[in-house]
Amino acid sequence: MLENPLIQQVLFEIMDEDVVGFDVLSVLINTNEVTDDEISRQLDVKLNNIRRILYKLYEARLVDYNREKDEETNWYTYTWKPSLEKVPALVAKKMKNVLNGLKEQLEMEETNMFFFCSDCEIKFTFEDAMDSGFRCPQCGGMMYEYDNKKDISLLKEQINYLEDEFTKNPLFSAY
């Protein structure tokens, strides 16, 4: 399941783009139940970093923990375990949001005329370009009509890819 690029992307975002998170998940999956301290030692990563990743995963409900108090030291030990059955639903929700955003962007691209400042590389709608007299508000340079056919084509490809993935991938069949 973790080999799926869509799942990897969503997990990467959940873990604040920290690739160590995948190592943490691997340890959790392979051991099924482990303390944060054991993960830290096994991966040779600072305990604070491991805990930060685990808390992010917990917020997404992708891991659970048990807390036990050591009666001698009065310290708590947290034992973590994976709870990855929620991953497909989480990814499906994220995919739907991305898909909706892409469809909105496609509609915007298809229903508007755009202008472009080649110096600043900023794209403007016709209305915004007209309001500024077809001069870039950043640099004052002249704006030129922008051909967005490639943008439209790319958006359609991305939408088709996500829709295909959503309908054909067995991970998402229930969603």
Swiss-Prot record:
Pfam families: TFIIE_alpha. It comes from the Archaea. Keywords: DNA-binding, Transcription, Transcription regulation. InterPro entries: TF_E_archaea, TFE, TFIIE/TFIIEa_HTH, TFIIE_asu, TFIIEa/SarR/Rpc3_HTH_dom, WH-like_DNA-bd_sf, WH_DNA-bd_sf. Gene3D superfamilies: Winged helix-like DNA-binding domain superfamily/Winged helix DNA-binding domain. GO terms for molecular function: DNA binding. Residues 3-88 form the HTH TFE/IIEalpha-type domain. GO terms for biological process: regulation of DNA-templated transcription; transcription initiation at RNA polymerase II promoter. Transcription factor that plays a role in the activation of archaeal genes transcribed by RNA polymerase. Facilitates transcription initiation by enhancing TATA-box recognition by TATA-box-binding protein (Tbp), and transcription factor B (Tfb) and RNA polymerase recruitment. Not absolutely required for transcription in vitro, but particularly important in cases where Tbp or Tfb function is not optimal. It dynamically alters the nucleic acid-binding properties of RNA polymerases by stabilizing the initiation complex and destabilizing elongation complexes. The winged helix domain is involved in binding to DNA in the preinitiation complex. Belongs to the TFE family. Monomer. Interaction with RNA polymerase subunits RpoF and RpoE is necessary for Tfe stimulatory transcription activity. Able to interact with Tbp and RNA polymerase in the absence of DNA promoter. Interacts both with the preinitiation and elongation complexes. HAMAP family: TFE_arch. This is Transcription factor E. It comes from Methanococcus maripaludis (strain C5 / ATCC BAA-1333).
